[in-house]
């Protein structure tokens, strides 16, 4: 079970919480589609900023969007011009004022989504897949990860028959609910077809029941802008 299910979904309410935090009765479908549109727009617009997560909260007054990015300077722009334009565009899409926060990711090497995207970009640049995977594993272990597992699948190296390659180092206990496991995926669009990249990173155990543990850890690492 633990090997098949998404490790983030399995731990929701234990040591992870949802990326969309709001309640709606009749408007649920509309707000869900709005969240999907906002996330797709931000990932497309900020593709060079290293965006890991987009958290959307909807208090009574106005929606609050928090962007977790490895390069916040790209989001903010010169003298804050880019972030002002981004806020206006989000407000136009949501048809109401939107509050925008940026949280810096200090260690992108141990963020599963960013690691997966980095490997996918290297595959698109025709870097050898084994070299890309091993380099990512070495960087993650050096910066404090207790374990990492990477899977690449597709026509690796332009092979005729698609296959999956896996590399692992350290512990990645997928069945342990108290384990703080980050999971991310990415797709590399190569000339031979698409290759999928999956990354699991084990960062230690969270012994207390704390759904906001990961958010608190990210906030401690970097001040909000």
Curated annotation (Swiss-Prot):
Single Gene Ontology BP annotation: translation
PROSITE patterns in the cross-refs: KH_TYPE_2, RIBOSOMAL_S3
UniProt record similarity statement: Belongs to the universal ribosomal protein uS3 family.
Annotated function: Binds the lower part of the 30S subunit head. Binds mRNA in the 70S ribosome, positioning it for translation.
Record's subunit section: Part of the 30S ribosomal subunit. Forms a tight complex with proteins S10 and S14.
Protein name per the record: Small ribosomal subunit protein uS3
Key words, A-Z: Ribonucleoprotein, Ribosomal protein, RNA-binding, rRNA-binding
InterPro entries (alphabetical): KH_dom, KH_dom-like_a/b, KH_dom_type_2, KH_sf_prok-type, Ribosomal_S3_C_sf, Ribosomal_uS3_bac-typ, Ribosomal_uS3_C, Ribosomal_uS3_CS
Molecular function as annotated in GO: mRNA binding; rRNA binding; structural constituent of ribosome
CDD domains on file: KH-II_30S_S3
Ranges of residues in domain KH type-2: 38-106
This protein's record includes keyword rRNA-binding: yes
GO cellular component: cytosolic small ribosomal subunit
Domain of life: Bacteria
């Amino acid at each position: 079970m633990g090997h098949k299910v998404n490790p983030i979904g399995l731990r929701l309410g234990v040591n992870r919480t949802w990326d969309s935090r709001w309640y709606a009765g009749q408007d649920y479908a509309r707000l869900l589609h709005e969240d999907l549109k906002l996330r797709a727009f931000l990932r497309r617009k900020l593709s060079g900023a290293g965006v890991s997560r987009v958290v959307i909260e909807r208090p009574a007054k106005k929606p609050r969007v928090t962007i977790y990015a490895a390069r916040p300077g790209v989001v903010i722009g010169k003298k804050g011009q880019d972030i002002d334009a981004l806020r206006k565009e989000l407000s136009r899409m949501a048809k109401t004022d939107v509050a925008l926060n940026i949280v810096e990711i200090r260690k992108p090497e141990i963020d599963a989504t960013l690691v997966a995207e980095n490997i996918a970009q290297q595959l698109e640049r025709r870097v050898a897949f084994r070299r890309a995977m091993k380099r990512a594993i070495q960087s993650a272990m050096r910066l404090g990860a207790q374990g990492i597992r990477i899977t690449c699948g597709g026509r690796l190296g332009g092979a005729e028959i698609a296959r999956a390659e896996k590399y692992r180092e350290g512990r990645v206990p997928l069945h342990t609910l108290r384990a703080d496991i980050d999971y991310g995926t990415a797709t590399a669009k190569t000339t031979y077809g698409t290759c999928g990249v999956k990354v699991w990173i084990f960062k230690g155990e969270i012994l207390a029941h704390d759904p906001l543990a990961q958010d608190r850890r990210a906030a401690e690492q970097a001040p909000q802008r």
